[in-house]
Amino acid sequence: MVTLTIDNRPVTVPEGTTILDAAKTVDIHIPTLCYLREINEVAACRVCAVEVEGVDKLAAACNTQVEDGMVVRTNTQRVRLARKTNVELILSQHVDHCVTCVRSGNCSLQALSKAMNIQEVPFRSEATERPWDKTLPILRDSSKCIKCLRCVSVCERVQSLGVWEVTGSGAHTTVRIKGGLRMNEANCALCGQCVSHCPVGALRERDDTELVFEALCDPTKEVVFQVAPAVRAAWGESLGLSQDKATEKRLAAAIRAMGVKHVFDTTFSADLTILEESSEFIDRFTHSETSKLPMFTSCCPGWVRFLRTEYPELAGNLSTAKSPQQMFGAIAKSYYAKLLEKEPKDIFCVSVMPCVAKKYEAGTPEASDVTDHDVDVVLTTRELDRMLQAMQINVAALPEEDFDSPLGRGSGAGVIFGVTGGVMEAALRTAYAKLTGENPPADAFREIRGQKPWRESTFHIGDITLRLAVVSGLAGARQLMDAIRARQVSYDFVEVMACPGGCSGGGGQPIHDGEDFTADRGRNLYQLDKNSTIRFSHENPSIQVLYNEFLGEPLSELSHHLLHTDQKTWTL
């Protein structure tokens, strides 16, 4: 243990602790801007400057380790002025379009400037905006970039892709796509983790809300909404709603209040995905001599892009089942269009997703089979919240309402798609029933739950032994793929989600700088599953009706046409 003094307070902490963490133990706040624990501890912003007795230069609290007998002062005049000057210099390279910025009110630089009482910037503005393709799912405004290097570190250390790089020096330092490439030329997964970790508005998703507003005013369009499982665990955060107010039923009511007549739940098509994917897995497993194993889940487009670009020889292991988003779009424009006596082109399908890469997936021609785009627009959770705010809807005052039928009923198994391991667990519940003729205990496969990036389990179903792996975060995915390629591990079924923690921590979820709500959202989804009256995808009566009236059975010819795809052919 190390004993030191911080602002005249004695502090004892383990060896290797930083000044920043030591100060937290005695409730002394040291401001930060670029810092992300264990990810970005490079002291690029110098906002966390402190005095250390006996040392001439100010120290960065975020990466300076404590020493026995050290005396630290965090709020002297010298420290205060240095921090203020550092923030003023950062502001001089950051365009001040706060009123129209998507992060206004949720911007760490804005909050820091206010806290430091900065009312003017005494330095000449040097912010410059560089060209960027505004059709891409992820947009970058270089005039707002503060060179904190978070995007560089997150992409390199959490996602193992290294899409971003630092170039230049001094006042000319900037961040760009590695090698000066355009984003659509780089091996970017479009996961959006760089967006959700940016402290300002330099990175954001493409905003497609106006397309939805226009469709709602078009009398020739039947606007159909689908809401992903993970969205219900996060949508109220940006609106200031408590968890007991931010329910899935109030979410349905809020979307309906925008003028949407058909409000459905993607949990329905998550159940549909399970019926198709579990059937495909059983078929592959029982014909292992001619099938590619392990079978990889395919509902995460960030993961699909990663596998295609980094391990193309393994792309054939992907399940051919479309994601719940794309399955829903296909069913909405075929089965549901017939129920409404409408043409497929008259259905305008909007999906609300916790994900930025879903925008790419919806625009991929090979992922649609009924029209050019089975899903017309993808909104992130953040975009939905902005629409609700733009329409001045008092969400908290709305009564709860159910999702519409017949595409609005889902099982608890479908709900847990939104958390890492959920797809695997849901698939195993149904695979067990198909192989044995009876349901397992609903929580029989809970062993695969958790937040560890790479988890593995072995389960026995009758006389069958299944070797399984679950991964979230692309750094973990890379480790797993390397091990599979080197034949160091052997599995039958593998679930991969690009974002740490799964969709709950998706790149399109509400941003809380310095806080991670992923695990809390996941627990919320597990509780919804536990409380559900239907916990098996194959027992969803709406799914049973869909097969009886339209599809026939899983893996039927029509199911293959509408619900399956060859990801190896997807346009990247």
Where are these regions (language model features)?
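Residues that cap or flank secondary-structure elements
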Residues: 11, 133, 143, 186, ...
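Iron-sulfur-associated redox domains of electron-transfer enzymes in respiratory
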Residues: 15-75, 79, 205-572
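Short strand-turn-strand beta-turns centered on an Asx-Gly dipeptide
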Residues: 6-9, 53-54
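Residue-level recognition of alpha-helix initiation/capping sites
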Residues: 14, 136, 146, 189, ...
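Fe-S ferredoxin-like electron-transfer domains
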Residues: 46-190, 196, 203-218, 222
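A short N-terminal beta-strand-loop micro-motif at the entrance of redox/enzyme domains
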Residues: 9-15
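Short structural boundary motif marking the start of a folded domain
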Residues: 1-4
